[in-house]
Amino acid sequence: MIENAGIDYKELYLQMQSAVVALSKTLEEIQKENKNLKEENEYLKRKLFGTKSETSKSLGFEQLSLFDEAEAEANPDEEQFILEEVKFNKKKKYKGQLDDKLSKLPHIEVIMTLPESELVCPVCNSKLVPVGKKFVRHEIEFVPAKLKVRDVYTTTYECRKCRANGKSVMKSPGIPEPVIPHSYASAESVAFVMKQKFVNGVPLYRQESEWKQMGLDLSRTTMANWIIYSSEHWLKPLTDRMHGILLESKHAHADETPVQVLNEPGKKATTKSYMWVYSSIKESSYPIRLFVYAPNRCGYNPQIFFNGFHGTVISDAYSGYNNIEGCVNAYCWAHARRKFRDSLPNNLENAENTLPIIAMNKIKKLFAIEKEIEALSPDKKVKIRQLKSKPLIDDFFSWCKSNQNATASAKLSRAFKYVLNHEEGLRQYLYDGYIPMTNSLDERVIRPFTTGRKNWLFSASVSGAESSANAYSIIEIAKANGLDPYKYLTTIFTYLPSQDLIKNPEIIDEFLPWSKFVQKNCK
């Protein structure tokens, strides 16, 4: 018989019980983590392989990618979640639609005639004479780009009478300054290179081959130097001036997107840098879109940009915008909606009463109100928002607080946490008719940059990234002011180099996109 040798079975039992509890807790945590990872995996698979457009009218939301969240307000009147088959109706063509489309293009007439030998009547052999012409069709003719060289000379004039009297009096016309000193670059060629890269997304290595096909060996290095010099000397004074104008306003949009810079001092080539985008609001008399390069995503970047600004910053609630002195933060409801959309269950067949759908339908009602009051004055918007939107928002946040702990989904928990943590900023639009419900304006401004980034992938240097920021700024500002970006760039590069901005800094205002001179010449 084996003796117990003084073993305290009660203590041993308690230890084993404690171990079982600890193991059960560990197992529960592992199962929870596993569930969250499965949820995240399914979400990423939907993002990667799923449909790129929504098929539900009740959702009514466009696909919101990371930096490309257009405000999806179309068809917000459906309040219940009902999946529907999308029907594609052929767009009806109206008489005169093609004529309107072609009206801005130059027209030439091509008149088909009979040869002289056939101008004979088949009945009596008399000569046929023209009695009218009948329109047959329009054809679009493509004229390939061609290069030519402008050989610039200056004429020297002399007074012969003074010469006869032993005096030498000569006079020559002033010569406009070139866009780049000691270069064969013209205003048009630099503007074209920028348009191709920053409007059409054509990287310099592809432009290099296109220029060669047109008859000129123009290296990508030369084009890069053109962009950097012209941006620094002629575009930056304009973006600096418009930065000052934006700081004088009371509202501004802000957003940011990553960019890779290869040769940045003190950083690995794989490290993320950022392009920050700041814009005036839709109602502004001076539409401004400014791209600013920064080596990181730290909050001091917007703090530096908004130094001296006293107003409301509309953003996606990124914490980097929280500590801007003198600023009120208004947050984007499209981002709030996206948090719930990302937490949707994989199977939407019986999703009508799930928490994400309920949340999205509550937010959808707010978007429907904004659609109704879109054309109203800011004062009237505030009145209707207080009357209609505020009760819905009160109900929404009350509902979120009641249901925030009623889910095991990590994504849905984060969605509740997001909206509750940013309630004050999400409510700001209720009190100011100039504040939009979303930050979609800045996200649309970023879109050309993110599209172009897919083609050129990275900037080779800090100076290249900064020049890209100035170029994107001027191009997006041109679009916002109804200008042709190529014409605006050409005008800047043609006239600004001959101006003395140090002695006459006020002359820069003549080149702002809303000036009479620019509006007349750059449409």
Identify the meaning behind each predicted range.
Residues 3, 10, 156-158, 163-523:
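Catalytic center-proximal scaffold of phosphoryl-transfer enzymes
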Residues 1-181, 224, 253-254, 385-388:
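Short, flexible loop/hinge motifs at secondary-structure junctions
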